[in-house]
Amino acid sequence: FQVHQPNRLRQYRFFDIGKTSHYYDDFTTRTILRRIAKKCYLPMNELLLEQIKANNGAFKVAFSITGTALEQFDRYCPEVLDSFRALAQTGCVEFLSETYYHSLASLASEPEFKHQVLKHKAAIEHYFGQTPVTFRNTELVYSDDIADMVDSLGFKTILTEGAKHILGWQSPNFVYKTTAKHAQKLLLRNSGLSDDIAFRFSDRNWENWPLTTDKYLSWLKAGDGEIVNLFMDYETFGEHQAASSGIFDFMKYLPSAII
């Protein structure tokens, strides 16, 4: 799951120049964060914790949480941070590393990119007591040059997009290797199955609506490889897909059905 919250900018007028250098709209940032926490982060974290316990640790998930999101949780909604810590303590949750600010520094500056990744790595260690071994770049952007930079930082695995125009006839449901010195494992997101939940779940015009646990499980079993990597915005649950759509019930029964 991806978790990100930007620092929102306030309206800054021409006549503010020279009078104030506070560019951020803290009130809006706090208001939006607390709304999403109530609708998504808190109930979904509770659901995942219940499923981890119910399945005796056989159910595992991974989070990629930006540094700006962690800062906002700490400042405006510490109960969300506590709920992520509770998940971390189960030993069934992995925290991935990424750029601290959800930036595209990997495309512009190697020193800045490495600085942000190491800053984010330190934040994960501070908040959750984990040292990340898997890296995912902003928007899953990937290239051989990025793999080399990530390799030099010691990461063992990279998560990226299973882009059809790159894969061609190949499947995203296998573990690949990078061209970097230490040939990290390369995990590819299954865009179709991920987007079925993230974007199409509540679309009544979709030919496969409604999406049930049994139907989705049959698609997973029909996979043509070793693994299926699902990766989506965490706000899918309760924010993008409303609770009334049944998204929480879907996720409640999916782990045990798969396991």
How would you label these PLM feature ranges?
Residues 1-134, 140-196, 202, 206-225, ...:
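Catalytic alpha-helical scaffold of carbohydrate-active enzymes acting on polysaccharides/glycoconjugates
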Residues 235-238:
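Periplasmic/ER-lumenal interhelical loops and adjacent helix-loop junctions
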